[in-house]
Design a protein with these regions (language model features):
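Local cysteine-cluster metal-coordination motifs and their immediate loop/turn environment
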Residues: 286-301, 314-332
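Active-site-proximal substrate-binding core of FAD-dependent oxidoreductases
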Residues: 214-216, 244-284
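FAD-site-proximal beta/loop scaffold in flavoenzymes
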Residues: 64-73, 155, 162, 181-230, ...
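Immediate flanking context of iron-sulfur cluster ligation sites
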Residues: 176, 278-287, 304-320
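A conserved FAD-binding loop/helix module that cradles the flavin
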Residues: 223-258
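A Rossmann-like FAD-binding core segment of flavoenzymes
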Residues: 4-26, 103-193, 201-203
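FAD-binding core/adjacent interface of flavoenzyme oxidoreductases
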Residues: 1-83, 167-174, 183-184, 194-196, ...
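Rossmann-like NAD(P)H-binding beta-loop-alpha module
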Residues: 61, 76-119
Length: 375
């Protein structure tokens, strides 16, 4: 098998007949010719991305994603002595707080928006997941000097040239916390764009799969966070099941199936515990930016009916991120369904699109004919 590192899939097309191959087009990050693969079977493991929810001041320099802060650390960014607030929801905040503390940052507050009772119940359920419980305890010990407050969330970031402080709400009261950096994020969103390009059904924001991890499109399998947020252990088990099924296994291994069921129960508890609270919607003012790429404020989209209208009238979702940041935010704020997915799935060079067009032409397809409008 050929292995291509440093490449991103930009288009994937389902065959017109059962005996025809799938066509997958990828682009190399460092240049070079596009990669075109004809495959009998496709396994999607597209992972997830951070979910950002708008609030006043979230576009200030110094406000970064929780996962983004971790990536900056790995790239050598300097946090020594900087006052950091970490706010949002989910277990990812703990290892990031530990990493920042280890890098010399002063973590002055970790604000978890989930209610205290819900988090306590979730922690008690980890008695059946001793490894996860031990890991969480170790992370907490790593930033023991910083308060970890439940039922607490940032309502505003304040500053001139960059963030200087945040306003936090807790127990019906607000207070100001001085900081140099705000790391924020509200969990993860499954990456389903490639699955939708192939015509796979999506339910509750994740790729729908059978017990063998097969999607609604025959010979296309999916595993990991694309099928729902559940953590590394669940992703690995799903990957084993999907790989075996793609290789011809009729049913998943019974031990793997039991392990998957247990981890899926954990994932459902995770989703219930750390679901963003309704109060976060009320933070967004008329002038608050909801689409950073195109500088679109809430007032410009609040009267519109869906993501398509937002694109037509305001260009929200048409910037560099192609709706990956503002899309989930607008869905949360207004209850909109996900917008239409069109190729390329990732920004691509013209040369790659040309190769894609030549590759799809024999099948009577073009890079722009493969469009999924539903979810």
């Amino acid at each position: 098998a050929d292995v291509h590192h440093g490449a991103a899939v930009v288009d994937a097309v389902a065959p017109a007949s059962a005996d025809a191959p799938f066509i997958v087009v990828a682009e190399r990050h460092r240049g070079g010719p596009a990669i075109v693969v004809h495959a009998r079977t496709v396994v999607l493991a597209t992972g997830a991305r951070e979910r950002f929810l708008p609030f006043p001041g979230w576009t200030l320099p110094g406000v970064v994603g929780i996962g983004g802060a971790q990536a900056l650390l790995k790239q050598g960014a300097e946090f020594t002595g900087r006052r950091v607030v970490i706010a949002g929801t989910g277990p990812l905040m703990l290892p990031v707080a530990a990493s920042l503390s280890g890098a010399g940052a002063r973590v002055v507050l970790v604000a978890e928006q989930a209610p205290a009772a819900a988090v306590r119940d979730f922690a008690m359920s980890l008695i059946w997941q001793p490894e996860a419980l031990a890991q969480a305890a170790l992370y907490r010990l790593a930033f023991l000097g910083a308060p970890y407050q439940l039922g607490t969330w940032v309502t505003e970031a304040v500053g001139g040239e960059r963030v200087e402080s945040v306003t936090v709400s807790s127990g019906g009261r607000t207070r100001r916390v001085a900081c140099d950096v705000l790391c924020t994020g509200y969990g993860l969103v499954p990456n389903v764009e490639l699955a939708r390009l192939l015509g796979c059904a999506v339910a509750d924001g994740a790729v729908a799969v059978s017990e063998s991890q097969e999607t609604t499109i025959p010979r296309v399998f999916a595993a990991g966070e694309a099928t729902g947020i559940g953590g590394v252990a669940l992703s690995l088990v799903e990957g084993e099941i999907a790989g075996a099924a793609a290789a011809g296994a009729i049913r998943p291994d019974s031990a793997l199936a039991r392990r998957r069921a247990s981890l899926q129960r954990f994932a459902r508890a995770l989703a219930r515990t750390f679901a963003p609270r309704a109060e976060l919607r009320a933070l967004v003012r008329d002038e608050t930016i909801v689409c950073r790429c195109e500088d679109v404020a809430r007032r410009s989209v609040m009267a519109l009916g869906d993501a398509r209208q937002a694109k037509l009238y305001t260009r929200a979702g048409m910037g560099a991120c192609q709706g990956r940041v503002c899309g989930p935010a607008l869905e949360f704020l207004f209850g909109w369904a996900p917008g239409t997915v069109r190729p390329p799935a990732e920004p691509a060079r013209l040369g790659t699109l040309t190769v894609a067009g030549l590759s799809l032409a024999p099948a009577g397809l073009t890079p722009t004919s493969n469009i999924s409008s539903g979810s």
